[in-house]
């Protein structure tokens, strides 16, 4: 169907939502804008869907949400009556239309006889993950676009273990969603009628209470809050973490917590930040200002759906510096393992899970405590899948999971990255070192002195349109067919191609299988242990380049990182130039 036909179909629909009808009238005559709204269906992929809010098949609106929900409902119905009875838990964040989309999803499922539980107000994504497990539900939905710009919203689907649906199950849901030809013909019953039938239940406080109890269980030294006064500055960046983080810190006894007033309340426009993402250092601007006034020991920031945590601490010059996800992960991991070992509660078969683009310092730390580290593909759903696998087999006992993009999980009562857990543990780690007269920054330098000065970097290259897509393909094809022999003056010794699950030991002309699902990712290791990785985005017209080095000092590792990233990007630029001709 052409975009024009889709547009006409919407325009001629008698009972079209009034707001969307008005939007279409506004766009009348703007061919380009209309084409963008209708030229395709908003894609429902393995991570759910995400897009701009608006009218059309390529936008987030009540009809595209109904379509996704009807597909999920068909998947659940096929599993039988028991699955329908167990039902689906639905949560949402602080974005435009999030409460409406959540209720639309609930109505669509409930109309099909599926029990639904909807939170009474916005909640963090990890609490949704916990609630699925706590209520023994068959699945979960969270309406969020994480830290995308304000004009976006999204929809993520969870399985009965509380983890994001793994690829195999997600593919079946995608099939069901794609089988629906006309999103405008999906009928839903009235909200009140479904509530009267008991098919839509509102949940909230009871889940919060149990979740907070579970949060406090991750503490290794609960007594620290009484022994040390830690000054905390916290910003939820207008999102969902404000109440749960404060509840959790209060339950653990940390009283000296100041919230950034301007960013405390939910705000769909994220008015005070360019991007509500703790990975962006600019997101800490208000927290740093308040931290300086208060002389805070630690600044913590969470993204809108509270699955990512950023922390900032004072460096040796007394200036607040934002730690990378790899650095925060190393501090949390080392604290957990060393303190559990001292208490005799570190299991022999403990395991650390990390993604393939996350720093090797985690493996070095885990190894020093006799623990294995297992790599997964990028995306926390793969970490959740591994936890489930080890839970069933008993091979390993999960200790910690993390990824470089600011996602951490400590207690497996949630199965997605949990910034609430990570925030509580970060404050405890800060208290632990403060008791010894050290800052978190000094603790990090100590870790580097012990394990090596690991340093990582990330660059993104956006190449839009048809030509951009071809250039991204050309970059990967070039590295694949002619792997570089040297980078940054060092020999490339290993090439990993995750698209064919193959590891090639270049110096030995030997091949090994990689036991991970296939993914279009390339990773190269140099003779000095440095590595770099190429990964095209599944949702945007860009390719990400990850770099990692290990040096003898901070300066040395910075220098090595600069040389490696410069060399790789020079090669990439040459490929792009040659395809632009």
Curated annotation (Swiss-Prot):
Enzyme class: isomerase
Biological processes per GO annotation: enterobacterial common antigen biosynthetic process; glucose metabolic process; purine ribonucleoside salvage
Comment on bound cofactor: Binds 1 Mg(2+) ion per subunit.
Pathway participation: Glycolipid metabolism; diglucosyl-diacylglycerol biosynthesis
Cofactor: Mg(2+)
InterPro entries: A-D-PHexomutase_a/b/a-I, A-D-PHexomutase_a/b/a-I/II/III, A-D-PHexomutase_a/b/a-II, A-D-PHexomutase_a/b/a-III, A-D-PHexomutase_C, A-D-PHexomutase_C_sf, A-D-PHexomutase_CS, Alpha-D-phosphohexomutase_SF
Result of changing residue 407 to D: Loss of enzymatic activity. Great decrease in biofilm formation. Deformed cell morphology
Keywords on record: Carbohydrate metabolism, Glucose metabolism, Isomerase, Magnesium, Metal-binding, Phosphoprotein
Binding positions (Mg(2+)): 146, 303, 305, 307
EC numbers, comma separated: 5.4.2.2
Single GO molecular function: magnesium ion binding
PANTHER family: PHOSPHOGLUCOMUTASE 2B-RELATED (PTHR45745:SF1), PHOSPHOMANNOMUTASE 45A (PTHR45745)
Homology family: Belongs to the phosphohexose mutase family.
Protein name according to UniProt: Phosphoglucomutase
Lineage of the organism: Bacteria, Bacillati, Bacillota, Bacilli, Bacillales
Gene: pgcA
């Amino acid at each position: 169907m052409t975009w024009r036909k889709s547009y006409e179909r919407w325009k001629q629909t008698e009972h079209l939502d009034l707001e969307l009808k008005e939007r279409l009238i506004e766009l009348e005559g703007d061919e380009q804008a209309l084409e963008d709204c209708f030229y395709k269906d908003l894609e429902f992929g393995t991570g759910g869907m995400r897009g701009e809010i608006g009218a059309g098949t390529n936008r987030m609106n009540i009809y595209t949400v109904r379509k996704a929900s009807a597909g999920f409902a068909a998947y659940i119905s096929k599993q039988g009556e028991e699955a329908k009875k167990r039902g689906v838990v639905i949560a949402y964040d602080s974005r435009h239309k999030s409460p409406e989309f959540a209720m639309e999803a609930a109505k669509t499922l409930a109309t099909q006889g599926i029990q639904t539980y909807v939170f009474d107000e916005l909640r963090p994504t990890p609490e949704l993950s916990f609630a699925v497990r706590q209520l023994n539900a068959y699945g979960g939905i969270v309406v969020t676009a994480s830290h995308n710009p304000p004009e976006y919203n999204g929809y993520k689907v969870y399985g009965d273990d509380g983890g994001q649906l793994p690829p195999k199950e997600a593919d079946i849901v995608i099939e069901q969603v794609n089988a629906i030809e006309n999103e405008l013909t999906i009928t839903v019953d009235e909200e009140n009628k479904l509530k009267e039938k008991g098919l839509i239940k509102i949940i909230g406080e009871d889940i919060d209470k149990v979740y907070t109890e579970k949060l406090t269980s991750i503490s290794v030294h609960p007594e620290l809050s009484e022994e040390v006064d830690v000054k905390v500055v916290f910003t939820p960046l207008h999102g969902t973490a404000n109440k749960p983080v404060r509840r959790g810190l209060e339950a653990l006894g940390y009283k000296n917590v100041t919230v950034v007033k301007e960013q405390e309340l939910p705000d769909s426009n994220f008015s005070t930040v360019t991007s509500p993402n703790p990975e962006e250092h600019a997101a800490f601007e208000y927290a740093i200002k308040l931290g300086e006034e208060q002389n805070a020991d630690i600044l913590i920031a969470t993204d809108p759906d509270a699955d990512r945590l950023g922390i900032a601490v004072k460096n040796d010059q007394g200036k607040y510096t934002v730690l990378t996800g790899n650095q925060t992960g190393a501090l949390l991991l080392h604290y957990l393992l060393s303190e559990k070992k001292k208490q005799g509660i570190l299991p022999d078969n403990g395991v650390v899970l990390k993604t393939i683009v996350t720093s090797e310092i985690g493996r070095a730390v885990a190894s020093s405590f006799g623990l294995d580290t297992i790599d997964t593909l990028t995306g926390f759903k793969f970490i959740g899948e591994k936890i489930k696998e080890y839970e069933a087999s008993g091979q390993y006992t999960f200790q910690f999971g993390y990824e470089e993009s600011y996602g951490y999980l400590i207690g497996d009562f949630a199965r997605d990255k949990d910034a609430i857990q990570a925030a509580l543990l970060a404050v405890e780690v800060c208290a632990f070192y403060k008791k010894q007269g050290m800052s978190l920054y000094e603790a990090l330098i100590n870790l580097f002195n012990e394990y090596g000065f690991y340093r990582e970097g990330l660059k993104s290259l956006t190449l839009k349109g048809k030509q951009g897509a071809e250039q991204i393909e050309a970059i990967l094809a070039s590295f694949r067919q002619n792997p570089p022999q040297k980078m940054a003056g060092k020999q490339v010794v290993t090439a990993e191609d995750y698209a064919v699950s193959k590891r090639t030991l270049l110096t030995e002309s030997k091949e090994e299988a990689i036991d991970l699902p296939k993914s279009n990712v390339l990773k190269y290791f140099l003779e000095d242990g440095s590595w770099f990785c190429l990964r095209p985005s599944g949702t945007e017209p860009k390719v990400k380049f990850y770099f990692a080095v290990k040096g003898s000092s901070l300066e040395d590792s910075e220098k090595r990182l600069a040389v490696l990233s410069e060399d790789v990007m020079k090669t990439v630029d040459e490929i792009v130039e040659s395809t632009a001709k």
